[in-house]
């Protein structure tokens, strides 16, 4: 069972530089940097549905990895994610993962 005491600090991104230096930083830092880059490239263009865009970029790989981890067991996957199974099924269908 998932340890509820774990914080978002457990979600890190590991990178290896050309000089073989390994760095780890929180996932939120990578998301923030990606958003800063995206917003910097807009050149004054209007943006709609940014929230949905970001969620889709995170949600789909999350669903994929959780379903792999639970070997396709939707009940376990839903419990792990803290959502009900019906919601999980809708999300899987949304991304064509059913």
Swiss-Prot record:
The chain's disulfide connectivity reads none
Pfam families, alphabetized: HTH_8
The UniProt keyword set, sorted, is: Activator, DNA-binding, Transcription, Transcription regulation
The domain of life is Bacteria
The DNA-binding region ranges are 74-93
Molecular-function annotations in GO: DNA-binding transcription factor activity; sequence-specific DNA binding
Q: What does this protein do?
A: Activates ribosomal RNA transcription. Plays a direct role in upstream activation of rRNA promoters.
The UniProt entry's sequence similarity note says: Belongs to the transcriptional regulatory Fis family.
Q: Which NCBIfam families match?
A: PRK00430.1 (NF001659)
Q: What does the annotation say about its assembly with partners?
A: Homodimer.
Recorded protein name is DNA-binding protein Fis
Q: Which gene encodes it?
A: fis
